[in-house]
Amino acid sequence: MTPSTSHISSQLRQLIYYHLDNNLARNALFLAGRLHAYEPRTSEASYLLALCYLQNGQVKAAWETSKHFGSRGAHLGCSYVYAQACLDLGKYTDGINALERSKGQWTSRNHWNKHSETRRQHLPDAAAVLCLQGKLWQAHKEHNKAVECYAAALKLNPFMWDAFLNLCETGVDLRVSNIYKMSPELYSMVSSAALEDVESQVLPPDGPLQTQVNPNPSLDPFTAGTTRSDSTSTHGSSALWEKLNGSTVSVASSGTGPHLPREGMETPGGQSSESDDPRVTNGNGTDVFEPPLAPAKKNRTIQTIGGDHPMDPPPKMRPTGIRPRTRTKFESDEGHTERDAGMGHRLGDRKRTVSGQVAHPSVPHSTDQGVGQRRSVRLFNQIKPSTNKISSTALGVKEGREVKKVRTTGNKARTTTSSNVGRVVSGNNRRHAGEIHDGDSKEYRGTSSTSNGSQNASSKLAISERTKSVEALAWILDLFFKIASGYFCLSRYKCSDAIQIFSSLSQGQRETPWVLAQIGRAYYEQAMYTEAEKYFVRVKAMAPSRLEDMEIYSTVLWHLKNDVELAYLAHELMDVDRLSPEAWCAVGNSFSHQRDHDQALKCFKRATQLDPHFAYGFTLQGHEYVANEEYDKALDAYRSGINADSRHYNAWYGLGTVYDKMGKLDFAEQHFRNAAKINPSNAVLICCIGLVLEKMNNPKSALIQYNRACTLAPHSVLARFRKARALMKLQDLKSALTELKVLKDMAPDEANVHYLLGKLYKMLRDKGNAIKHFTTALNLDPKAAQYIKDAMEALDDDEEDEEDMA
């Protein structure tokens, strides 16, 4: 017998998702190749093959495989993989166009809170697609459109963290509190998710079969499934039943199994449709296909019915939440014989009666006319049994489990179709059936009392679960708000605020590598290298293999002139990953500290080869070119850094430095101001602007910049020194003396400070103090002896030496 085409592809898809979920990418790729060979024209096979190529790092192959369906927007999965490959390959416009053409397939999707250990959605939702679209626009230098995409993604899913990070990198102003707050949409989604969890866990109390309502037809081996959702009970109306369901019942191809949950499924396996609703295959190789279900075994002998030891149940599927159509006991089996017989070839694995008719389902929702439907049943219409007696599988119910269900039916109460079940079991439980019919009045009383108790318990559990879920979501939102606020402040170089926010986190969240690294970066941006080193040391101790932010750590060690630790860090990072740009930056900084600029340049070039978007690597190249006085090459390196990241202020600072050395003061001032616009709290950049203005004989404007720098960094020796010098040029000697006295206490061993004090006392005609400070400067810096001696010899001269030693 030739196997079903749909079942072969279904099994292959199930195996592919199994290996993907277990991170066995090579196995998944091989199986995806088999599926694509079996169904070369289907978009689903192309999507899975392209996805496996992408998981294996074969970006070009993923791009080629997904191009046919992805570039046209014919399949959402193909378009998504195609766009991801385009992002890596630099084909940004192609990826953007592909996502735009598939917009109708993802614009209404929202899978937030629909993923768990047992559920998955293998196709992306709107938030994921918008985030990818934002990355493509950002790489294409269309920052406004990128911001729109990131904002839309965060509105749908505030936990799309990389969308928030990229939004911060664009430099746009944000109100973080508006992102991480409990919106009505979030509240609704988390409440519904909590309700589903309750429905999947609540087990009705023991009692007659009428009280153990099983609204999910997929859990009843005798129920013919239907794909239509949210229909009401017919309560005996055969005409309404046929109006709602049509002349035939819609089931999966060949009747291999019940329908899957609307919102997700257990793994292994995955929804193969492009919508959230389950779809079935038509068997001709088109894109309409069933979810990957395992077919039930057929041709079991009649002896199986009498088995006392059924096979172990496969993993349970989540209930679908689809309300099944029901029949009442007033509907005769003979009235539907022709319809059931017409379904026989598709429901070949279902139980049949002795006469050969397909067994009708036991009624899941309707009871006797005298018994009203329970409120708890209406509220929770997806109860998943957890006992062995009534559990079954959504991946194809085996006969062993069916028999157990039948025996349970016989031992307990009977629904309104008890006559049908009696024929199915061929008399095995007729005695019990008679007993049940004799005790109808007792059944009614038991049903009523059990229904009230179940209703109260279910309602209380639902309220409790919803409350706990909302509280948990509020806690996570508050955590994300704090972390996001800290990162946003750091991206705006409000370093003190960032440190304060990160420090306010709970100890468990604060003492993590990522948070500690951000605090270290904040201290680094403030030029507080000793404090920054302390945090990076803790990061390295917690995560020895961490590469992120290690280029900053190596620069901190370079500033601290800690050659030994810098060399050790470089060796450690190379052992972790020789192909990481951070490792090569650390090696380059080590060579730079040893004044081996050529070797340092080679290392920094290697870093940018490994990652062409690594802006800091280009900036470090520029610094080395400046050290070698190769200014033209330095300009090219800094411009490459700006091209990689337009908000990388270090590259703008480098350009200003080069133009300053070349004597192009106007260009230098412009680039220093560009850098200060990005990082307005950096005192060094403000001092650079003041220095250029001072060289342009504009000491008043320079003094304004120096005052601003001293306000930003009160402990900055450089800012206070240049402020004192500007005051001396403006003949404000008393203010200059005040600044220098403070500076002397801050840096008592700085020769330039004592030299400037000597000059100031000379201007004040205080020769004693002038000689004292000149002598101190001479002792601290013997290399500047010539300058200091000339100043001491000119004590009696009225001419003022405007030069300093630096």
UniProtKB/Swiss-Prot annotation:
Sequence intervals crossing the membrane: none
Gene Ontology biological-process annotations: anaphase-promoting complex-dependent catabolic process; cell division; metaphase/anaphase transition of mitotic cell cycle; protein ubiquitination
Source species, domain of life: Eukaryota
Any GO CC annotation of this UniProt entry: cytoplasm
Residues covered by region (BimA domain): 260-399
Pfam families: ANAPC3, TPR_1, TPR_19
InterPro entries the record matches: TPR-like_helical_dom_sf (IPR011990), TPR_rpt (IPR019734)
Localization in the cell: Nucleus
TPR repeats: 76-109, 127-160, 513-546, 581-614, 616-648, 649-682, 684-716, 751-784
Classification via Gene3D superfamilies: Tetratricopeptide repeat domain
Composition-biased stretches (Basic and acidic residues): 328-348, 432-445
Predominant location category: nucleus
Disordered: annotated segments: 202-348, 353-372, 401-460
Claim: Transferase is one of the keywords in the record: no
Bias (Low complexity) ranges: 246-257, 446-459
Family indicated by similarity: Belongs to the APC3/CDC27 family.
Role of this protein: Required for the completion of mitosis in Aspergillus nidulans.
The name this protein goes by in its record: Protein bimA
Gene coding for it: bimA
